[in-house]
Structure formats: structure tokens, C-alpha cells
Amino acid sequence: MCSFNLKTSILLVGLTSLALAAPHKRATCDRVLLVEAADAYLDTIRSGNVSTLTPILASNWTYTENNKVIDATTGVIAKSLVIDHSRTNYDYAQCATYTELISASDASKPFVIGSQIRHNDDGKVNSIDIIASTTNSWLFNATKTLSYVVQERWDTIPEGKRDKREAIQAAGDAYMDMWSNATAHQAVPWGTPCTRLEGSAYTGKGAADDSCQPGIPSNHNQKPNTHRRYVIDEEMGSVSIFCIWEHMMNAADSHEFRLEDGKLRYVHTMTECGGKPCKL
């Protein structure tokens, strides 16, 4: 089982409370600020030099990797990775971003990573929260994941067709509740076509009737997915949810959902089990 200490638990409770709090726009939070921080983070991933982040960091910032608070210089952020794909979503209400990145071309350091970056009221980064999947992670194959991701279209949704952030989060929560709630699947706004990328396993076949429903849980008495942290981007119809995947070795988990016209279109998942092979 993955270890999960009290200090980490307290921090994640705080992050969850922050994510669920009534959102408010900070005077200093705009796209320029969020893009600058996301770009600096990606530059750090490439270089492996964590000190380059210093100008944008709050004095009390925390680095969380796979649900554990650690020294950033010992984490994946310091490994100097080749970035073959990245996409960043922007949550102005929470002054936060979510970045999906894939490093597949260096076979010695394959990773698929999700990152939530949060800013304080002064605009400084006070939290970098990462789910880093790699060898032994659930259904992991960075090369296959990359091949599927580049086929998808994550265009900005026209303003008049965007779902409200509450609806986007509710869709993600309903999906995440299916393991512990027998009726949760009824609240998921299933769309067609819809494709799920679970690690490197893809439900899409390029057909109009592609569905995200194959393989959803039939056992609803499993442990819940807890300590959820959210980044919501209405322009992309997306919610990123980080959590503890309790029924699979207390794994560190990332689920991202995209809604189009109120219906589920894409699901991306990453699940990491403390360096051990993930097993149900």
C-alpha cells in the first residue's frame, strides 16, 4: 500500500478546501500571470533546474508529488525531461492552472504528468501539485498515450456554448463517485462520441458511437475517491480532479474531463501507486 502520512493528509485537506471554496477573482490574476507561471514550470521540467522558479514562488510554497509533500529538488520536476506534448487549462476563479504533459521520446525517463499550480492573492505560486505516472503506473505506456492524445481536438469552446463551472465540476464528481455510489452513473452526462484514455488504454475507434461507458464500475461498494482537488476551465469545458484512489492501493490519481454541449467528450486518467505495480 502507498504510504500516506498525517502531514500530507492535512495539506491535502487544505488544498481540497481551497478548491471547493467559493471562487473569487484576485485583482492580480489574469491570463498573463497564469501563462507566465505555467511556462516557467514547463521550462523547469525541461532544464531540471528548480531554482529558475524562484521569482514566481511564494516564500511558503509547497511541492506535492503523488500526494506526498517532498523537496522539489528530489522530484520529477528536477529530472530534465523532453516534453513531447503539453496542454494547459486556466482557472481564473481560483487563480490556478492544470497542465498535462507527456515525455515519451526518452525511453529511459518516460512520464505522463498532470500538474495543478495555484497562486496566492499576491499572484505568487504557493502550490505545485503533481501526479507523475511512469513505469508501473496503471496501464502506463507514454508512447501509446502520446499517439492517442495528438489525435484529439481540444479547441476552445465558443463563448455561447460553454457550460458553467458548477456543471463541469458536477459531471466530474458524478463520474468519480461511481465506485462508491450505485446511482452516480445516472448523473454523468454521457456523450456520444466520447473517448476515455485510461493510462494508455483508449476506448476510441474514431467512430461516431465511441463511448466512455465500457468498463465503468459495476461494483459500487468500493472505497471512495477522496481528497479531491479541482482546476476548472470553462473555455475548455474541462475539470481536472486530483485525488486518492483508495480502492487501488491508495494511489495518486488524476482524472480530467471535457464537456462539449453539456455532454462528456473526453476522459484522461493517470494513476500512480507509490512506485509499485498498480493492482486492483
Question: Can you annotate each of these PLM segments?
Answer:
Residues L20-L280:
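C-terminal and inter-domain tail/linker signature
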Residues M1-A27:
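Fungal secretory targeting signals
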